[in-house]
Amino acid sequence: MDESRPLTVSEAFTLYEKDLVARGGNPYNAEHPRTHLPAVILNKPVSLLGATELRRWRDSLLAKGLAPGTVNRAKTGLRAALELAAAHDPRITNQRAWKVGLSALPDAHRARNVILDDATVRRIVRAAYDHDRALGLMIEVAAVTGARLSQLARLEVADLQADGPEPRLLMPLSAKGRARNKRHERRPVPITPALAAVLKQEAQGRAPDAPLLLRANGERWGHGRRRHHRNDFRAVIEAAALDPDVVTLSALRHSSIVRMLLVNTPIRIVSTLHDTSVKMIERTYSRHIAEHTDALARRALLDVSQRLADSNVVPMKA
């Protein structure tokens, strides 16, 4: 990259994608917004961008029929690329252009999470094992832990604690929104003894720093590379008599979160185990929290319609 001339938006995306890969992030965050940008913006120097044209681009995505949440994700990726470019090039001084032009759309967070009951999740896991053992194991770990594929891909053999009555995985934190030095941290996530036994057998003979979960060809699952599982997972969902356009791998994560909420697990514990925030849990799963809160509260309701004779109160004689 020629540093003697101003960076273009396209070059800013290239820089951002390399930075994401270096930090263990998802390069899709750079690829996705790039596909929605016209050549006139991609080829333009970052330093010449204006708020009006960026706002016009953002609003054009809505006109094309993209959901507000999708538009917000696209503009967030563009903003991140532009911020990184400005950090590398002191000649870029127009940060206000994207702070104003790429402001977030209001009320764009409308959760459309697919929640599956336990029987359906088990059916998916069985179908996955029937399709491909390596895929089945990855999907079972996803179903039990509720972790993202990006986290599962970074699990190492040493992260498995299979011995003892309370087996667990030391789950890598997501790189999402974290500083570079945070992505190597792990948090213990409980797993079932049966799953621990399978993982221990699969990991036998591998080095401690070797990937715990491998694809059928022996390679690591590539987070951010949907081709590694997309078509196979669609086939699994169809085999489980479900709609692959509705049920995605994320449904296992959403179902895990709701499963914990419905057995009265404190929200802070749920958020920690699923590597998210209390705020996000409350915002995304508010309906399920409200339903469960209602069920708990009803147990303590006083029914004043019961006959007085049914109580322990003895009326006084005249």
Q: Which functions belong to the PLM regions below?
A:
Residues 7-65, 81-83, 235-238:
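Basic/aromatic-enriched alpha-helical hairpins
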Residues 68, 72-76, 87, 93-149, ...:
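Basic, Lys/Arg- and aromatic-enriched nucleic-acid-binding interface segment
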Residues 99, 103, 120-123, 154-201:
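Conserved tyrosine-mediated DNA breakage-rejoining catalytic core shared by Y-recombinases
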Residues 115, 173-177, 274-299:
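Catalytic-site neighborhood detector that most strongly recognizes the C-terminal catalytic loop/helix
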Residues 127, 187, 283-318:
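DNA/chromatin major-groove-contacting recognition/catalytic segments
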Residues 140, 144-151, 251-277, 291:
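C-terminal catalytic core of tyrosine-transesterase DNA break-rejoin enzymes
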Residues 159-166, 246, 265-284:
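Short, polar N-cap/turn motifs at the start of nucleic acid-interacting alpha helices
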Residues 178-200, 209-235:
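C-terminal catalytic core of Y-nucleophile DNA break-rejoin enzymes
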